[in-house]
From Swiss-Prot:
Name the UniProt record assigns to this protein: 3-isopropylmalate dehydratase small subunit
Subunit structure: Heterodimer of LeuC and LeuD.
GO molecular function: 3-isopropylmalate dehydratase activity
Top enzyme class: lyase
Amino-acid biosynthesis is among the record's keywords: yes
Similarity section: Belongs to the LeuD family. LeuD type 2 subfamily.
Coiled-coil residue windows: none
Tree of life domain: Archaea
GO annotation terms (biological process): L-leucine biosynthetic process
Function: Catalyzes the isomerization between 2-isopropylmalate and 3-isopropylmalate, via the formation of 2-isopropylmaleate.
Amino acid sequence: MIIEGPVIKFGDKIDTDIIIPARYLKYTDPQYLAQHAMEPLDPEFYKKASKGVIIVAGKVFGMGSSREQAAIALKAAGVKAVVAESFARIFYRNAINNGLPVITLPNSTKEIDENSYVKIDVETGEILVGNKVLKGKGITGMALEILQAGGIMEYLKKMQTVNRN
């Protein structure tokens, strides 16, 4: 699974209240949530992300309260993947379950510049930036299968169909 696109960069400790503020949690429409993704840091994020971007961030991306809407909002906004030094565990699972690839890369914010164009091999974790290859932690096994299906619901539907035959 290869993903590529331009980079939008954020720092450390981007919590779920920043990814999607609590006042929008009563809404369920992914496109509505997308319009408010990252709003506290960048009110124009939705417009920038709409063409398809890769977020590069620092430590503990997705920390804070558990909210599935954070991954939903990012994906619906046009985020193709998130590369970070580390992720909050619950955000990591929510991202996979919603079909949003998340790659752990040491020193991600030092290695990749804003507006760089990156190409990511999700399975191996290799990230091509210009002529430099960085080695992140790839996604394998069932998590990769869930991503390839487009998320946990699509994966379960696929498994149900396979089991019927």
